[in-house]
UniProtKB/Swiss-Prot annotation:
Protein purpose: Involved in DNA repair and RecF pathway recombination.
Keyword list, A-Z: DNA damage, DNA recombination, DNA repair
Keyword Hydrolase carried by entry: no
Organism this protein belongs to: Psychromonas ingrahamii (strain DSM 17664 / CCUG 51855 / 37)
Protein name per the record: DNA repair protein RecO
HAMAP family listed in its UniProt record: RecO
UniProt keyword DNA repair, yes or no: yes
Gene: recO
GO cellular component: bacterial nucleoid
C-alpha cells in the first residue's frame, strides 16, 4: 500500500455516511485532493479537533482514483485566528480554490501565497490588499493573467492619461465611445495594478472590480456562497 504525505489545508468538508467525512484538501505538492476521512465525525475525533480549516496540517493518505482515504492528520501550526468578517474572507478564498482548482494539479507558489494570505487577513489593519493580491495570483496561476502594460489590440503601451476597457482572458484596450462608464479603467490604475501598488484607494477599487470580473467568468457566473454570507453582514 503506497502512502503519500503532504502539507495541506482543508478547503471543504461535508458528512459522509454515518461517521465519516468527505474532505477536499489543498496540498502543497499536488494541489486539490479529495479524501474520505473514516470516522471523522466520531465523538473521539471531533473532540481531538485536529482536522480543522485554516490550520497547516500534515496529512497521509492512500488509495487510487479520484477519492483517496485518510490515514492520519497532524497539525503543524495552531489555527489561524479568524473571526467576524475576516473569517468570511478566509471562507471566500477557500471557496475560490475549491471551485477553481483542478484535481491533483500542482500550483507552483499558490500554496505559499494562500498561507501568507490567511496570516495577513488575520493580522492586517485592512485585509483588502492581501485579498486582492491573492485573487490576482490565483488568476495568473490558473493561466488567465493579463498584460497590464500594453493595449491588446494596438500593442501600444498603456498610458496613464487614457481610459481602457477589459476583455476577459485577454487584457485591456482603448475605450470605445459607446462603452458604459462603469466598465472603464483609467490607465493610471492599470499601471498601478501592474506594480501591485495599492497605496491609492482608487487603485484598490479598480483591483476589486477587475478581480470580480475575471473570477465571475471563471466561475461560470455561479454565485459564491461565502460572498453571500459576507455581504449579508
Amino acid at each position: 500500500m503506497s502512502i503519500e504525505c503532504h502539507n495541506a489545508f482543508i478547503l471543504h468538508r461535508r458528512p459522509y455516511r454515518e461517521t465519516s467525512q468527505l474532505i477536499d484538501l489543498f496540498c502543497q505538492d499536488v494541489g486539490k485532493v479529495s479524501l474520505v476521512y473514516k470516522g471523522g465525525r466520531s465523538s473521539t475525533r471531533m473532540r481531538r479537533g485536529t482536522a480543522q480549516p485554516f490550520t497547516l496540517l500534515q496529512v497521509s493518505y492512500f488509495g487510487r482514483g479520484s477519492l483517496k482515504t485518510v490515514k492520519s492528520f497532524e497539525a503543524q501550526t495552531q489555527v489561524v485566528p479568524l473571526v467576524g468578517q475576516r473569517l468570511f474572507l478566509a471562507m471566500y478564498i477557500n471557496e475560490l480554490l475549491y471551485r477553481l482548482l483542478q484535481a491533483e494539479t500542482a500550483c507552483d507558489g499558490l500554496f505559499e501565497c494562500y498561507q501568507q494570505t490567511l496570516l495577513a487577513i488575520a493580522g492586517a489593519v485592512d485585509p483588502q490588499i492581501a485579498l486582492r493580491l491573492f485573487e490576482l495570483t490565483l488568476i495568473e496561476t490558473l493561466g488567465y493573467g493579463v498584460n497590464f502594460s500594453e493595449d491588446i489590440y494596438s500593442g501600444e503601451l498603456i498610458e496613464s492619461g487614457y481610459e481602457y476597457q477589459y476583455q476577459h482572458q485577454a487584457g485591456f484596450f482603448a475605450k470605445q465611445a459607446i462603452h458604459k462608464q462603469h466598465d472603464v479603467y483609467s490607465g493610471q490604475d492599470i499601471l498601478a495594478l501592474a506594480q501591485r501598488d495599492f497605496s491609492n484607494q482608487n487603485v484598490l477599487k479598480s483591483a476589486k472590480r477587475f478581480c470580480r470580473q475575471a473570477l465571475a467568468n471563471l466561475l461560470g457566473g455561479k454565485p459564491l456562497h461565502s460572498r453571500a454570507l459576507f455581504t449579508a453582514k
